[in-house]
Amino acid sequence: MKCFNPHLEILSEVQQWVYPQLRNLKDLGFVLYGGSALALQLGQRQSVGFEFFLHGRLKQKLLRGACPLLGDESLVTQIQDSENTVTFEISPPDSGKGIATISFFGNLGYGRVGEPRLTEDGVLVVASALDIFATKLKGIIQRPSTEDFADIIRLIKSQESLLEALEAASILFGTDFSPMLALKALSYFDELKPPLSQVDASFLIEQVSNTLKNISVRNIERPSLSVNS
């Protein structure tokens, strides 16, 4: 597995406090996705939460064993609890640090396209930019947000291909994903709050137009989320 030097400076103060306590999660097969995964790789937009995905079923006893912090009721409040989704809100001893959330999603059997990467300090396994891109394209169809649009723009500007991300999402999510609906969603941003800048809006329109000329979907093997599982 390739390593990268994470942009820890982009994390909030409370996330930096939590970060080293997440080291054992990778041994259970957890892979970091979402805005924080992207921020660690690109060093740009700050995200206040960690989102961990797991290929298999979520087992809370093992989860709490790997991350004892989650069992400290003086610091942690569980705000969501379902069979394969749990979310915790963390307030460190120094309340001035703020609050962070950690979410865990299990039984995500759709696999991956890119190769996850390990932070050089050995703390986290992080999803590839392509896989994060694919999940964000699916997300904007259902729940468009300015944050996801901003992340997609950053991904494209960091040389990630919109066309390849559409192909990846089509393979990962099958009939639950429509490339054309994703492109339509990328072209409809008038109701986003806060709104996109005119520069970003024009950039997206140009990218969608260029992609429409070349869109296609290829078959790609779907291994599990983690390299070791």
Go through each PLM region and give its residues.
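Compositionally biased terminal segments of proteins
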Residues: 1-229
